Curated annotation (Swiss-Prot):
Enzyme class: transferase
Enzyme Commission designation: 2.3.1.-
Residues the record marks as active site: 114, 211, 241
Keyword Transferase: yes
Organism encoding this protein: Vibrio campbellii (strain ATCC BAA-1116)
Pfam families named among the record's database cross-references: Acyl_transf_2
Keyword Magnesium: no
Pathway annotation from the record: Lipid metabolism; fatty acid reduction for biolumincescence
HAMAP family named in the record: LuxD
Protein name as catalogued: Acyl transferase
Amino acid sequence: MSNQCKTIAHVLPVNNGQEIHVWETPPKENAPSKNSTILIASGFARRMDHFAGLAEYLSENGFHVFRYDSLHHVGLSSGSIDEFTMTTGKNSLCTVYHWLQTKGTQNIGLIAASLSARVAYEVISDLELSFLITAVGVVNLRDTLEKALGFDYLSLPINELPNDLDFEGHKLGSEVFVRDCFEHHWDTLDSTLDKVANTSVPLIAFTANNDDWVKQEEVYDMLAHIRSGHCKLYSLLGSSHDLGENLVVLRNFYQSVTKAAIAMDGGSLEIDVDFIEPDFEQLTIATVNERRLKAEIESRAPEMA
């Protein structure tokens, strides 16, 4: 088995000299061909290299896969997380999507986890997606933030907010984040329902039965508001909101999302499909190679590290 890194790195220049880093994983040779190209939007405080395993699963099954790090987030792209907002996440996703279109990429299927799923729901009616798959996707941002942070900071006047909100060891700039939530209506369940109601994009949502941050009944509510009915909910049994908490949960996530992508590429919402599973050595090699690639890119631009 080759130890050569198959990941292809791209850099997209954006406004004010900023850059979005994108990684490309081509489909494996001799893999069954697919109609769709996959774009992966990582969850909050997760970098694109955290999804190396999922990219390998999808590539092994014939998908061309792209991932990116959002602006003002963890990872390789420009900016610091204390300036991150949901609108920044939206703009980063749309920039990468439109870049793929300029490359002639058609039939883009989007996979989004956690907070990035809320971004995906925001734009689902604006982008021409083949399908959307979400995992532990946030539908009620205010409620999820209260669960994650231990307090409903969105209830405070702006001038009473702390300087930072500590989210999994990362410092969110509270004022810029909260102002954006209110100004662009990111905060409520109803705002999510309004965005998805008229979409015709097929959607599979994965919840986790031990997720303390996202209420499964609210995900059901969201799907019930999609008038097309082209949607289905599945549960990742034994998982919490942290899809990487152990290898069993992580493997189930990889398998389930890969099967969903195969099914939806074929026009179905039923994920009882055959798939090819990469072996552990292959996943390990891909992960190690991407860590080296990340370190190499950071060494060329220390200010991004």
